[in-house]
Swiss-Prot record:
Matches recorded under PROSITE patterns: RIBOSOMAL_L24
Coiled-coil portions: none
Entry GO CC: ribonucleoprotein complex; ribosome
CDD domains named among the record's database cross-references: KOW_RPL26
Origin species: Heliobacterium modesticaldum (strain ATCC 51547 / Ice1)
Family membership noted in the UniProt record: Belongs to the universal ribosomal protein uL24 family.
Keyword Chloroplast: no
One matching Pfam family: KOW
SUPFAM superfamilies: Translation proteins SH3-like domain (SSF50104)
Gene name of the encoded protein: rplX
Keywords: Ribonucleoprotein, Ribosomal protein, RNA-binding, rRNA-binding
Protein name, UniProt field: Large ribosomal subunit protein uL24
Ribonucleoprotein is among the record's keywords: yes
Length: 111
């Protein structure tokens, strides 16, 4: 079975809409399509106990971001200043870009 498609990409600015971190905004660090999960910067922080190793000689308790379900985040439109649903549109140069459904602004930074 093919991996399900996730509506957000690495580097997108998103807002968490449900759960303990609802309302927080952050950038997507990692997308895990096989599990339909995303890792968002400074959201869903967990504490992990790590043994001393070469990379971390001190060891101890480390705080890091844990994955959350992709359905719990929405793309944040800076022009509307709110989380929005995204649509797709072909631009004049022939590229396909994601757009804000509210204001029509292009959400892809590179397009």
């Amino acid at each position: 079975m093919a991996n399900p498609k996730v509506h957000v990409r690495k580097g997108d600015l998103v807002q968490v809409i449900t759960g303990k971190d609802a309302g927080k905004k952050g950038k997507i660090i990692e997308v895990i399509p096989a599990k339909n999960r995303v890792v968002v910067e400074k959201v869903n922080i967990v504490k992990r106990h790590s043994k001393p190793s070469k990379t971390n000689p001190q060891g101890g308790i480390i705080e890091k971001e844990a994955p959350i379900d992709a359905s719990n985040v929405m793309i944040f439109c800076p022009k509307c200043d709110r989380p929005v649903r995204s649509g797709h549109k072909f631009l004049e140069n022939g590229d396909k870009a994601r757009i804000c459904r509210k204001c029509g602004d292009v959400l892809d930074k590179d397009k």
